[in-house]
Curated annotation (Swiss-Prot):
Annotated localization: Cytoplasm
Domain of life: Bacteria
Lineage per the UniProt record: Bacteria, Pseudomonadati, Pseudomonadota, Alphaproteobacteria, Rhodobacterales
Gene: dapA
Keywords tagged on the record: Amino-acid biosynthesis, Cytoplasm, Diaminopimelate biosynthesis, Lyase, Lysine biosynthesis, Schiff base
CDD domains: DHDPS (cd00950)
UniProt KW Transmembrane helix keyword: no
Pathway: Amino-acid biosynthesis; L-lysine biosynthesis via DAP pathway; (S)-tetrahydrodipicolinate from L-aspartate: step 3/4
Subunit: Homotetramer; dimer of dimers.
Protein name as catalogued: 4-hydroxy-tetrahydrodipicolinate synthase
InterPro entries: Aldolase_TIM, DapA, DapA-like, Schiff_base-form_aldolases_AS, Schiff_base-form_aldolases_CS
Organism of derivation: Ruegeria pomeroyi (strain ATCC 700808 / DSM 15171 / DSS-3) (Silicibacter pomeroyi)
Entry similarity comment: Belongs to the DapA family.
Active site: Y132, K160
Length: 290
């Protein structure tokens, strides 16, 4: 259903407003370069700084531009269950193929609270839901046992795992079953993630290097890890450079170098230090992008 290289899309801005023309260009470019899905309004899409109206506009524009050519997994997370229900129901109404729902952040629910939250979202709509487990940002870590309980619900179909713990893939295969879709949320470890049983990556770097990331994923899914390692060596400096500062800022800077969108971000994020720009430039050259 969902596999391969799927960019966690940036949200382009110009003069403080959504740049929808740039967003459409990005969607066309991503599909043309081989991305197998699109994931708007996640962390990399600056969802914390989007109004509800902007959030819904971005999802609607991406669904419209994709036009069914690749699946769209719409960001729909919140630390407020009622608000998350709104986002999931909107994603369904507008025609998204699935919703990506982060574990609630800041208010630190228990595992029982996580089950209640995701069960409510499962029951509110008919589209598949992908859990987004990123304890480094949300503070709450969904355990494999909790995920296994949720995987029994028919529309809880997978996880974007950004724990950085490769053992989790095997643990979650045991608790959720081999058909549960496991997608890496961390570019640098995506090779190992797939070797453990993952089937793709919701990627920051794929914003900038979609063809390379898509071909890397194709190699891993074909079991050609020698070829995948060649791609990994080419991409690793870029994975690292993009995340010297917040990854979405690095991705937008790199996209600006390619002429695809402005590097503008919303406060409290700021533009990159010159040293970070130089590192990204060098990594893009190493990857053959410049």
């Amino acid at each position: 259903m969902f596999k391969g290289s799927m960019p966690a899309l940036v949200t382009p801005f110009r003069n403080g407003e959504l740049d929808l023309e740039a967003l459409k260009r990005l969607v066309e470019w991503q599909i043309g370069e081989g991305s197998t899905g699109l994931v708007p309004v996640g962390t990399t899409g600056e969802s914390p700084t989007l109004s509800h109206e902007e959030h819904e506009t971005v999802v609607a524009e991406v669904v419209k531009a994709a036009a069914g050519r690749v699946p769209v997994i719409a960001g729909a997370g919140s630390n407020n269950t009622t608000e998350a229900i709104r986002f999931v129901q909107f994603a369904q109404r507008i025609g998204a193929d699935a919703a990506l729902v982060v574990t609630p952040y800041y208010n630190r629910p228990t595992q029982r609270g996580l089950i209640a939250h995701f069960t409510a979202l499962h029951d509110c709509a008919e589209i598949p839901i992908v859990i987004y487990n990123i304890p480094g940002r949300s503070v709450v870590d969904m355990t494999p046992a909790t995920m296994g309980a949720l995987a029994k619900l028919p529309r809880i179909v997978g996880v974007k795992d950004a724990t950085g713990d490769l053992a989790r893939v095997s643990q979650q295969r045991a608790s959720c079953g081999a058909d549960f879709i496991q997608l890496s949320g961390e570019d640098a470890t995506a090779l190992g993630f797939n070797a453990h049983g993952g089937v793709g990556c919701i990627s920051v770097t794929a914003n900038v290097a979609p063809r390379l990331c898509a071909e890397f994923q194709q190699a891993t899914l074909a079991g050609d890890y020698a070829k995948a390692l060649d791609y990994q060596d080419r991409l690793m400096p870029l994975h690292e450079a993009i995340f010297i500062e917040p990854g979405l800022v690095g991705a937008k800077y790199a996209l600006s170098k390619l002429g695809l969108c402005s590097e503008e971000v919303r406060s409290p994020l700021t533009g990159l230090e010159d040293s970070t720009k130089a590192a990204i430039d060098a990594a893009m050259k190493h990857a053959g992008l410049l």
